[in-house]
């Protein structure tokens, strides 16, 4: 989910760039590109992960800066909100030079929109003009070099599918898992007979990624998944949407409601139009269906949507039973049956201003209660927020993936909840190493060959950047029947009280 701190400086740029880009872009938008749709009838009868179309592309950053690697896109058969509901979507494969053919990292980029034009796959294309309107997936794509430099093949699915079903986790989970199947089936990748997969997603990408972890055992257990990484996790849809209302990125309240309803339209029909929205609400929905996240955020910056102006009677979205039912179905940890069975690294800022810490922590605890293997790292500094927490954790994410690909537990296994109380940004050495690496990696992809033989990440992950040794205070190790995860959250009255309680307990030695 993205991100109030970037909206201000993007507002003018987007306003000026959108007409220019729309007029001059040389690559058709997804809604106008036949590649995004099956060419023949009968695709519904194909197995999930079957390749329906394929093409080689020139990958680029911001539409013009070419990436020096091999890139393909495939349209593949997948499933929608339920395993028996056939669907299709596109994924993008990035292959670095000297790639390890047995290691694939699947990245769920945040899209946070109800418009197929905002799909990550389109953001990878070289269009010939500077593209910044759909900045949500583009900024994260600039960080992919961190994984490509390791020699790992990157798989980046359009996890919202043709419906652009933002916040519908199960829907996206199927599409993530089937993108892994598609990778295994795609011969040009030349993968080994049983390649290892790791899934990663932050913020809006954590939802499909977390659900892929949850559905792996029941839906695609033949996949050799060795781990999952997720942070800033939106694990409870309605909880998150309610907490965002009236905040800078409040347009996501409408976008999230639309996404949930679109994923289950055969069950709920036109609930939003028939029962929920006022005329102003319908206008807002139309805006969401025709814009990417920054455009909608700028237009509705700080709007309170759960009010009489947008919702009939000024009701809360949770007051509709259908909405509660679907949200519960898409809440991670709600159903013990869908518990991840592969190691998970989760991280979250205690004072995350976008996605409340409580819901992610609750999900981790519930997963642990049901036998999952979770390492949950909390950042308790008030100065660490949504975006900076992600950037500062990139070395940790890479280290976790390295260890998992090499068969290591990374931290000893089981469930473990830790807190890092010192802001890493206050440590000049860590700040310099982390951000220099990120910046160098981003710049490196502009004109150089990308792969493990370049100079970017060599010796990047030193002991000072490993969460097992750096500024880590062990909060508690979870044991069977002994779950006590502490308190924290955003700056609401309830969360401030909880955070104060946590600090008091820590001071008196209850957390050590």
UniProtKB/Swiss-Prot annotation:
GO terms for molecular function: diacylglycerol lipase activity; monoacylglycerol lipase activity; triacylglycerol lipase activity. The active site is at residues 203, 352, 386. Glycans are attached at residues 316, 361, 453. Residues 1-17 form the signal peptide. Keywords: Disulfide bond, Glycoprotein, Hydrolase, Lipid degradation, Lipid metabolism, Secreted, Signal, Virulence. Induction: Expression is regulated by environmental pH, and is expressed more highly under alkaline than under acidic pH. The effect of temperature on expression is marginal. Disulfide bonds join 118-292. One of its GO terms (biological process) is lipid catabolic process. Residues 498-512 have a biased composition (Basic residues). Optimum pH is 7.0-8.0. It comes from the Eukaryota. It is found in: Secreted. Pfam families: LIP (PF03583). Residues 488-497 have a biased composition (Basic and acidic residues). It catalyses: a triacylglycerol + H2O = a diacylglycerol + a fatty acid + H(+); a monoacylglycerol + H2O = glycerol + a fatty acid + H(+); a diacylglycerol + H2O = a monoacylglycerol + a fatty acid + H(+). GO terms for cellular component: extracellular region. The keyword Metal-binding does not apply. Residues 480-512 are annotated as: Disordered. Its EC number is 3.1.1.-, 3.1.1.3. The keyword NAD does not apply. It is an enzyme of class 3 (hydrolase). Belongs to the AB hydrolase superfamily. Lipase family. Class Lip subfamily. Secreted lipase that hydrolyzes acylglycerol lipids such as triacylglycerols and consequently releases free fatty acid. Can hydrolyze 4-nitrophenyl palmitate to release 4-nitrophenol and palmitoic acid. Due to an absence of fatty acid synthase genes in Malassezia species, secretory lipases are essential for the yeast to generate free fatty acids from degradation of sebum and assimilate them as lipid sources for growth. Plays an essential role at the pathogen-host interface during disease progression. This is Secreted triacylglycerol lipase LIP5.
């Amino acid at each position: 989910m993205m991100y109030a701190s970037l909206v201000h400086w993007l507002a003018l740029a987007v306003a000026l760039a959108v007409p220019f880009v729309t007029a001059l872009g040389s690559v058709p938008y997804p809604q106008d590109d036949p590649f995004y749709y099956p060419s023949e009838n009968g695709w519904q009868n194909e197995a999930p992960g079957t390749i329906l179309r394929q093409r080689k592309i020139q990958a680029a950053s911001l539409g013009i800066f070419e990436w020096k690697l091999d890139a393909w896109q495939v349209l593949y058969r997948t499933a929608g909100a339920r395993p028996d509901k056939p669907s299709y979507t596109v994924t993008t494969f990035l292959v670095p030079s000297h790639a390890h053919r047995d290691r694939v990292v699947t990245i769920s980029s945040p899209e946070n929109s109800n418009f197929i034009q905002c799909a990550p796959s389109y953001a990878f294309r070289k269009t010939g003009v500077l593209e910044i309107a759909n900045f949500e997936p583009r900024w994260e794509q600039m960080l992919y070099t961190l994984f490509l430099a390791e020699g790992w093949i990157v798989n980046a699915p359009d996890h919202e599918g043709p419906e652009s079903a933002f916040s519908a986790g199960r829907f996206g989970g199927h599409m993530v898992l089937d993108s892994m199947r598609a990778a295994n089936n795609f011969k040009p990748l030349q993968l080994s007979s049983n390649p290892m997969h790791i899934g990663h997603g932050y913020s809006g990408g954590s939802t499909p990624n977390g659900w892929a972890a949850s559905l792996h055992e029941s839906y695609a257990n033949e996949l050799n998944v060795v781990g999952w990484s997720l942070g800033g996790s939106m694990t409870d849809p309605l909880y998150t949407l309610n907490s965002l209302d009236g905040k800078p990125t409040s347009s996501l309240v409408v976008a999230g409601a639309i996404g949930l309803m679109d994923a289950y339209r055969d069950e709920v029909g036109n609930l939003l139009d028939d029962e929920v929205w006022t005329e102003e609400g319908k206008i807002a929905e139309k805006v969401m269906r025709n814009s990417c996240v920054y455009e909608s955020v700028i237009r509705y910056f700080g709007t309170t949507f759960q009010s009489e102006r947008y919702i009939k009677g000024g009701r809360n979205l949770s007051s509709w039973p259908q909405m509660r039912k679907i949200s519960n179905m898409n809440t991670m940890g709600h159903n013990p049956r869908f518990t991840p069975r592969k190691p998970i690294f989760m991280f979250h800022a205690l004072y995350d201003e976008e996605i409340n810490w409580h819901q992610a922590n609750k999900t981790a605890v519930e997963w642990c209660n049901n036998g999952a293997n979770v390492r949950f790292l909390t950042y308790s500094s008030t100065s660490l927020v949504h975006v900076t927490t992600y950037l500062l954790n990139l070395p940790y994410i890479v280290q976790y993936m390295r260890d998992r690909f090499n068969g290591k537990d990374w931290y000893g296994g089981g469930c473990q909840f830790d807190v890092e109380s010192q802001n890493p940004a206050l440590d000049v050495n860590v700040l310099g190493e982390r951000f220099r690496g990120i910046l160098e990696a981003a710049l490196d992809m502009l004109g150089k060959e990308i792969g493990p033989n370049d100079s970017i990440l060599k010796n990047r992950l030193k002991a000072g950047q490993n969460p097992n040794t750096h500024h880590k205070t062990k909060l508690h190790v979870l044991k069977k029947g002994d779950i006590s995860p502490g308190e924290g959250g955003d700056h609401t009255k309830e969360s401030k009280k909880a955070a104060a309680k946590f600090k008091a307990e820590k001071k008196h030695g209850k957390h050590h």
